[in-house]
Regions:
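Accessible peptide chain termini
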Residues: 1-2, 178
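Short, Lys/Arg-enriched N-terminal segments with co-localized hydrophobic residues
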Residues: 2-12
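N-terminal, charged low-complexity regulatory/assembly segments
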Residues: 12-172
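Residue-level detector of conserved catalytic or cofactor/ligand-binding positions
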Residues: 178-186
């Protein structure tokens, strides 16, 4: 199993703690089950880890989708009949985020996307709503106003956004369950 690697940044990583937790859950279920089928327990463990890996990549894809949505809004504003100076020359810091640029060229993530055929296009309303919450936040405003232009600052923005808007998002939990459990729904 290959994980999407990004320097010093983790989201919902399949780490040792998660693996240990899944093993304990499977062992408990194994002993609670009267048949004691070791092969079934092993299959359940691999299935569970596979779904955690899917969720990890799905959340990485959400960051890319949010950035792409921001770019679409910028493009639409520039294409207006009479755009303002701010619309013609917007602050591009969010859409030119170095961390997201790294994700967009990550071969493992792109392979996952093409193999799983998952996308956020079907949930544009969710992406739009989440983006609007992000733009209204102090985290976003401080980032956009900052003169710091580094990979670390870009990565830190996404760490803060993830903790604030993605980590405990009930609507996202529901969407994730739907998409991860029904792979044919997308595309």
């Amino acid at each position: 199993m290959h994980l999407v690697k990004t320097p010093v940044f983790t989201l919902v990583m399949i780490n040792r703690v998660l693996i240990r937790l899944k093993i304990i859950q499977i062992v408990y279920a194994y002993y609670q089950n009267g048949s004691k089928n070791l092969d079934a327990a092993e299959k359940e463990l691999f299935f569970s880890l596979s779904k955690a890996y899917d969720l990890y990549n799905y959340l990485l894809m959400l960051m890319i989708a949010l950035t792409n949505y921001a770019q679409k809004r910028i493009d639409a504003a520039k294409a207006k009949l009479a755009p303002t100076a701010e619309e013609l020359y917007p602050n591009m810091k969010f859409v030119e985020n170095k961390f997201i640029s790294q994700l967009e060229v990550n071969r493992q993530l792109m392979d996952f996307i093409s193999n799983q055929k998952r996308t956020w296009e079907n949930d544009e309303d969710f992406v739009k709503g989440l983006f609007e919450k992000i733009v209204a936040s102090d985290i976003y405003k401080e980032y956009m106003a900052s003169s710091e232009n580094s990979y670390e600052a870009d990565r830190e923005l996404w760490r803060k956004l993830y903790k604030t808007f993605i980590f405990n998002n009930e609507e996202l939990d529901i969407l994730s369950l739907i998409h991860i459990s029904e792979p044919t729904r997308l595309r």
